From Swiss-Prot:
Name of this chain's protein: Maturase K
Functional note: Usually encoded in the trnK tRNA gene intron. Probably assists in splicing its own and other chloroplast group II introns.
Family: Belongs to the intron maturase 2 family. MatK subfamily.
Entry GO terms, CC: chloroplast
Main location: plastid
Localization: Plastid, Chloroplast
Gene Ontology MF terms in the entry: RNA binding
Classification via Pfam families: Intron_maturas2, MatK_N
Domain of life: Eukaryota
Length: 509
């Protein structure tokens, strides 16, 4: 227990003072809108709209200096001049200033790590693109997975308390608490489906930063406790990607020394099931080679961990235990599972013949066709049954522009789902988009689809129908013709377009 406390104290020792005066500096709000400065500290947000000016900031600072405007009661909160007419505008400016200021301590730590002044403790963090090869290399060797939905209904006070571990400037934290309590409907700010107000859309950077800091606090403690429970240190998040057969070698080592009595106590720790942890946004998975009982213990541990350490109700139904050979895992826009392929080998020794049945595990990724059709139906490309319809809103565009837009959507979907094991399910999506494009053009020219295609021919859709196989062939024209067969296998692209939207099936078609 003392070692855990020392670890937490070490992590929280890098605290920074005197952030409160920065709130009243005009240049802070200018920097918050300067994309060049934001890019230098790796915190660029392309969703910014530059609407602040020195005049607005001066008025804001003047009103913030008047402390009587911060005395708000439930009866006169709507009549307070500070939050009255320009409430959304002021909240946007304050939120951007807060987001910029509270990111300063984290940016300093990040820059110092990049310059080699400090050992990076978050060495297990990886880009989202590393998740796909990690799943492909490791999931075929695993048995069970915990599908976890991280709680998002976090109380504002818990978020402020989490931030206090890193920033001990009481004045700025009090002002932040006041700002959050005045505005915050936390469920609508974190959950994108409910974020319909202009305030929620404009101030997501601050609230997402607070929520991510809360999740980071949970993960840092969880990973530390996990590493203390085994002799295999820090094996999560794909650190050992280049050592795919590492655990097979360990099992081989166990078989070699199994007859040695002195190794019995140590071998129990070595043979402990390996745990892999991956998180993307609000969803995380914990996979292992262990048994169902072993995963149930981890499920109980997660529930207790969230409830006692973070004072947050965490219902057990938010954690699902799935066996990879029987269930599919929905993650990052794919349905992932482990398929068992039976293989029969005939062996003959002299006059005796034997049939040996081998079960080969293979990582399988499928395209979730039903959610994709639902997204297309929501965007009015088809109905709920998947029958294509025209897009009246695009009938005013030129023919080439209409084809380019439909083709871009089709190529993005094909590009993202190129890692699928079975690409035949994408043909239906291409059919919906192709026929929807044809019906939109026919409606524009007041003709039928058949007559329109017969008059113009099918060549005008060649760019629209270009598949990933053709893209590979055009990219590597000097390579052998056998390269076309590469398309039949799984391909993970590292330049995925609109990965966040496609991973959540919320693409803005």
């Amino acid at each position: 227990m003392e070692e855990i406390q020392r670890y937490l104290q070490l992590e929280r020792s890098q605290q920074h003072d005197f952030l409160y005066p920065l709130i009243f500096q005009e240049y802070i709000y200018t920097f918050a809108h300067d994309r060049g400065f934001s890019r230098s500290i790796l915190s660029e947000n392309p969703g910014y709209d530059n609407k602040s000016s020195l005049l607005i900031v001066k008025r804001l600072i003047t009103r913030m200096y008047q402390q009587n405007h911060f005395i708000i009661s439930p009866n006169d909160s709507n009549q307070n001049p500070f939050w009255a007419r320009n409430k959304n505008l002021y909240s946007q400016i304050i939120s951007e200033g807060f987001a910029f200021i509270v990111e300063i301590p984290f940016s300093i730590r990040l820059i110092s790590c990049l310059e080699g002044k400090k050992i990076v403790k978050s060495q297990n963090l990886r880009s989202i693109h590393s998740i796909f090869p990690f799943l492909e290399d490791n999931f075929s060797h695993l048995n069970f997975v915990l599908d976890i939905l991280i709680p998002h209904s976090v109380h504002v006070e818990i978020l402020v308390q989490t931030l206090r571990y890193w920033v001990k400037d009481a004045s700025s934290l009090h002002l932040l608490r006041f700002f959050l309590n005045e505005y915050c409907n936390w469920n609508s700010l974190i959950t994108p489906k409910k974020a319909s107000s202009s305030f929620s859309k404009r101030n997501q950077r601050l609230f997402l930063f607070l929520y991510n800091s809360h999740v980071c606090e949970y993960e840092s403690i969880f990973v530390f406790l996990r590493n203390q429970s085994s002799h295999l240190r820090s094996t999560s998040s794909g650190v050992l990607l280049e050592r795919i057969y590492f655990y097979r070698k360990i099992e081989r080592l166990v078989n070699v020394f199994v007859k040695v009595k002195d190794f019995q106590a140590n071998l129990w720790f070595v043979k402990e099931p390996c745990m892999h942890y991956i998180r993307y946004q609000r969803k995380s998975i914990l996979a292992s080679k262990g048994t169902s009982l072993f995963m149930n213990k981890w499920k109980c541990y997660f529930v207790t961990f969230w409830q006692w350490h973070f004072s947050l109700w965490f219902h057990p139904s938010r954690i699902y235990i799935n066996q990879l050979s029987n269930h599919s895992l929905e993650f990052l826009g794919y349905l992932s599972s482990v398929r068992i392929n039976p293989s029969v080998v005939r062996s003959q020794i002299l006059e005796n013949a034997f049939l040996i049945n081998n079960a080969i595990k293979k990582f399988d990724t499928l395209v979730p066709i039903i959610p994709l059709i639902a997204s297309l139906a929501k965007a009015k490309f088809c109905n709920v049954l998947g029958h294509p319809v025209s897009k009246p809103g695009r009938a005013d565009l030129s023919d080439s522009n209409i084809i380019d837009r439909f083709g871009c959507i089709c190529r993005n979907l094909s590009h993202y789902h190129s890692g699928s094991s079975k690409k035949k399910s994408l043909y239906r999506i291409k059919y919906i988009l192709r026929l929807s494009c044809a019906r939109t053009l026919a409606r524009k020219h007041k003709s039928t689809v058949r007559a329109f295609l017969k008059r113009l021919g099918s060549e005008f859709l060649e760019q629209f129908l270009m598949s990933e196989e053709d893209v590979l062939f055009l990219t590597f024209q000097k390579a052998s013709s056998t390269l076309r067969g590469v398309y039949r296998s799984r391909i993970w692209y590292l330049d995925i377009i609109s990965i966040n939207d496609l991973a959540n099936h919320k693409s803005k078609f």
